[in-house]
Amino acid sequence: MAYVDGFLLTVPARKLAVYRRISAKAGKVWKEHGALEYRECVGDDVNVKHGLPFPKRTKAKKGEVVVFSWIVYKSRAHRDRILPKIMQDKRLKMDPKDMPFDMKRMSYGGFKVIVDL
């Protein structure tokens, strides 16, 4: 069964183009190493009247946008096998200070797929 790494973070709107460039490069690396899908999505209709809106969930500050992303693998074993190779890929090496978002505020985790249509 497929396995998904999911991410929820905020990015200053003025740094979204930089984030997009970094993410496009990262996505190519993930796919080259075997990820099935790599998606980065920016919030568009997120201030809903029911539930807890993403901006509140992420404590988005003025001028920040919410980013929701995910990476799909064949299985958790597949993810666990390729992730160390991805983390060692020199194309992804960056000083955390140069990231266009606050990594301490990012939420992420691995998820078992329970419905796949």
Language-model features: locations:
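Generic detector of contiguous secondary-structure segments
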Residues: 18-31, 66-71
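Glycine-rich beta-strand-turn "strand-cap" elements at beta-sheet edges
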Residues: 31, 35-62, 88-117
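Long, hydrophobic N-terminal alpha-helical segment
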Residues: 1-25
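Short amphipathic alpha-helices in soluble, non-transmembrane regions
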Residues: 20-26, 82-90
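Short, well-ordered beta-strand segments in beta-rich or mixed alpha/beta enzyme
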Residues: 4-11, 50-86
